Amino acid sequence: MAYLNVDEITSALQNLAAAYPATTELITCPHPTHEGRQTQVLRIGTRPASEVDGVLLLGGVHAREWVPPDALVLLAADLLEAHGKSKGLRYGEQRFSATDVQEILARLNLFVFACVNPDGRRHSQAGDPLWRKNRRQNNGGGDCVGVDLNRNFDFLWDHLARFAADSGVRTTADPCDKFTYRGPAAASEPETRNVVWVLDTYPRIRWHVDVHSAVPVILHSWGSDRNQTLDPGQNFLASAFDPVRGRPNDNAYREYITEDDLDLVTGLAGRMGEAVRAVRGDDYPVEQAYGLYPTSGASDDYAYSRHFANPAQGKVYGFTIECGHSFQPTWAEAEDVIREVGAGLTALCAAVTRLSPEPGQVPSPAAVSGTSPTSRRAPGEAETLA
């Protein structure tokens, strides 16, 4: 088997929707890409999107990272098959019971956005394998092409104004930069706007995971500066801190997060890491996103920031999984990485089935603690091997 191309990803999602009409909905995003492609999201769950909380899973934001779209397509197929056959799932030594699978689909909606950036993936697979961005023409048909979609979201997007000059924030306003051009405006790109549209259209989404590669790590907010839980006034909305935001090794500014939220996201990230490790022993450490380097315009921080910028919006907890050790591993290696992603994301979903807050209410971190998903497996329950 080989990596799925853009058309095969689309066909796979459509085929799953046709095969499991009672537990899926195929959602067409409103904004065509620069090359005219229409992207789709597969909603998985037994209850309407308005009744239960949702988990948004993104893949393929960066074109050269070939594993994440395949991993999300295969996770969707695994969950739907296991649910339909009343079986559990096994990824290496990580097991989930049939009860786990049934509860995930009954108590959550999963929004599988397997390939956010199809133009970029097509270009990468057509002979420019390290291509990262989308395919916007930045200079009227010249050779300055593409926006880094994970620098284009409306979170501290204007890094020149919102970060210290010596912060080292990993983005650029140079439209000819090959890797991290932020775009001409926040959410300028149709691919970015499609993600925003999903969050706007389905306000019960509470969890957001952007799957990337290739440094094995599980990241949580914030990516703008080190976290702190004591001073709410130090936050991304406070322009007074723009001259010092993101500066390394100083205490002039740190990004505020509530203690409950910090406990919650580190606990859930830890759950994902434990499940990944059980697949084949590979370690995905948990880290605050800023620990890699300061960023602006990232999808996970944008998702989490929405509630702070507008308290009427429900809180969405953002994560990034960086999977595997290379952008395009051999297929044999990719299969193991796909199992790791499947294990981590299923563990997250199993954990958050115990967290069903009303819109705008913060779930208790204590609900994340307790027995692992495997402990609910009844003797003799069947498994589907992934």
Task: List each language-model region with its residue ranges.
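Loop/turn elements at helix/coil->beta-strand transitions in domains of secreted/extracellular proteins
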Residues: 21-24, 37-39, 52-54, 106-111, ...
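Short beta-strand-to-loop junctions in surface cap/lid or active-site-entrance loops
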Residues: 41-50
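Short, solvent-exposed loop/turn and secondary-structure capping segments
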Residues: 52-53, 67-70, 122-128, 160-162, ...
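Short helix-loop-beta-strand segments that form the rim/entrance of peptidase-like active sites
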Residues: 68-124
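Glycine-rich, aromatic-flanked loop segments that form ligand/cofactor-binding clefts
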Residues: 102, 108, 113-151
